[in-house]
Amino acid sequence: MSKLGVLLTICLLLFPLTALPMDGDEPADRPAERMQDNISSEQHPLFEERHGCCKGPEGCSSRECRPQHCCGRR
């Protein structure tokens, strides 16, 4: 039984319980901070408000902007 106690003591010294994240440290518990860190799509420089259109250097000719509804095409 003393071997188990020694092993437990060594494990707790090498990996203390304070190293584990607690429930309060989860980002899901802090939505206000999570929203400040997250860049929404409206603030992204390559996003145009028209349903996912790009306005980067390649414009609608890039592969990401090929939908028919993009950039005024119907």
Curated annotation (Swiss-Prot):
Cell compartments where the protein resides: Secreted
Entry-linked Pfam families: Conotoxin (PF02950)
Keyword Ligase: no
Modification Cysteine amide, positions: C71
Domain of life: Eukaryota
Keyword tags: Amidation, Disulfide bond, Gamma-carboxyglutamic acid, Hydroxylation, Ion channel impairing toxin, Neurotoxin, Secreted, Signal, Toxin, Voltage-gated sodium channel impairing toxin
Expression by tissue: Expressed by the venom duct.
Modified residues (4-hydroxyproline): P57, P67
Modified residues (4-carboxyglutamate): E58, E64
Annotated GO MF terms: ion channel inhibitor activity; sodium channel regulator activity; toxin activity
Function: Mu-conotoxins block voltage-gated sodium channels (Nav). In vitro, this synthetic peptide displays a low blocking effect in mouse extensor digitorum longus muscles (IC(50)=616 nM).
Family, as annotated: Belongs to the conotoxin M superfamily.
Name of the protein in its database record: Mu-conotoxin-like T3.1
Species this protein is from: Conus tulipa (Fish-hunting cone snail)
Phylogenetic lineage: Eukaryota, Metazoa, Spiralia, Lophotrochozoa, Mollusca
